[in-house]
């Protein structure tokens, strides 16, 4: 059996995926892991940690749910199109159509977030624009439900993405934290409930108060 030392991949992620995935699938995830790590090289979050820690933690949580290799790879890559010098054609060419579609789906959903992943960057100017008092809940929820109908894995990645962002929300200004918490309670926790993923639902609710 191939051991963790034979992979250039985080031990926390490896320890979860080696339980249920074949070696070829782990190699595929390793490829996405290294691609995303290099793409995000030099980028930081407000916490001071490497930006890559965010997609890595997103992937680790989905590995807890024992999702397929394409989903784990897409979780690792979910910010590269929006935040790096990379486009969806690059993702499709290197990782295939399935992963590319998942990344595109998450990218489209993220554009509806009141607080996006990019706002966790220390270069963000929080005073460029005000947050609207009324979050467009119905429109955002409609798009997420449409994504569920197309491929539920897109929403699962987005839920894991939101979970890690909520765990690091303390580094945002108060107005951003309040807006993001409200959006999480009104949109993301109910979606987790709808999917029957109780652990994510409870965690999101706890982190929103």
Where on the chain are the PLM-derived regions?
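Active-site helical microenvironments for divalent-metal-assisted chemistry
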Residues: 1-209
